[in-house]
């Protein structure tokens, strides 16, 4: 039976980078759930949808392109803010939750692991995941990472603005009524503030190799 590896954590903590490395090591497909919300947010922005019109937002789900996961547009501050707002809408979450839960089923028993990365994977989407990892890092560290990422993509951005936006995003994610950001009770917490991605990768790799299930 396919084992679920759930990787949760706040914005710019390194979830996607870690998921890619684990995917390569264990030949496991990855679903970046946060990018689903980002792609939906991008469609909402492009189509100038009123954020109070939930039905119109839901119709935008049909336009999500899973082949466009690496688009630089997904990492703009506007997309970041809009994705946080729409992810708090119950109807939107229910639609995308169903999509996420169906993802491992498409592989049957042909693979050993599936990686799902997001903010509520271990608490809501897959509460019985075999491995639950919660990544954390200080907000100033995450702001610097986001700043460097955007600069690499040719964006002219302000570190102080990004730092402020990350703190606002954290407050929204942690205090929202629906699926607030928090570690699952039985998750492994890894603070990435002062360790590099290789150290985080090795820690998770060892957990997977040495632990039967969580």
What are these regions (language model features)?
Residues 5-7:
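Hydrophobic anchor at the beta1->P-loop junction of P-loop NTPases
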Residues 10-13:
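ATP-binding Walker
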Residues 16:
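Walker A/P-loop
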Residues 35-112, 120-123, 140, 144, ...:
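ATP-dependent small-molecule kinase phosphotransfer cores
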Residues 131, 182-198:
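Phosphate-binding beta-loop-alpha motif at adenosine-nucleotide cofactor sites
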Residues 148-153:
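Conserved AAA+ ATPase "sensor/coupling" helix adjacent to the nucleotide-binding pocket
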């Amino acid at each position: 039976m396919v084992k679920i590896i759930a990787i949760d954590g706040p914005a710019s903590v390194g979830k996607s980078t870690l998921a890619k490395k684990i995917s390569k090591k264990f030949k496991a497909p990855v679903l970046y759930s946060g990018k689903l919300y980002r792609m939906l947010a991008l469609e909402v922005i492009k189509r100038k949808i009123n954020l109070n019109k939930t039905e119109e937002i839901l119709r935008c789900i049909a336009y999500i392109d899973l082949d466009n996961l690496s688009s630089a547009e997904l990492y703009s501050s506007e997309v970041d803010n809009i994705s946080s707002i729409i992810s708090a809408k119950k109807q939107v979450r229910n639609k995308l939750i169903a999509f996420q839960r169906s993802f491992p089923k498409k592989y049957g028993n042909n693979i050993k692991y599936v990686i799902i990365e997001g903010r509520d994977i271990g608490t809501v989407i897959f509460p019985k995941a075999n491995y639950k990892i919660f990544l954390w890092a200080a907000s100033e560290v995450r702001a610097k990472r986001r700043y460097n990422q955007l600069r690499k993509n040719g964006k002219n951005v302000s570190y102080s603005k990004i730092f402020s936006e990350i703190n606002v995003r954290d407050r929204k994610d942690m205090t929202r009524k629906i699926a607030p950001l928090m570690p699952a009770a039985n998750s492994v917490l890894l603070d990435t503030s002062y360790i590099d991605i290789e150290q985080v990768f090795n820690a998770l790799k060892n957990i997977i190799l040495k632990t039967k299930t969580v």
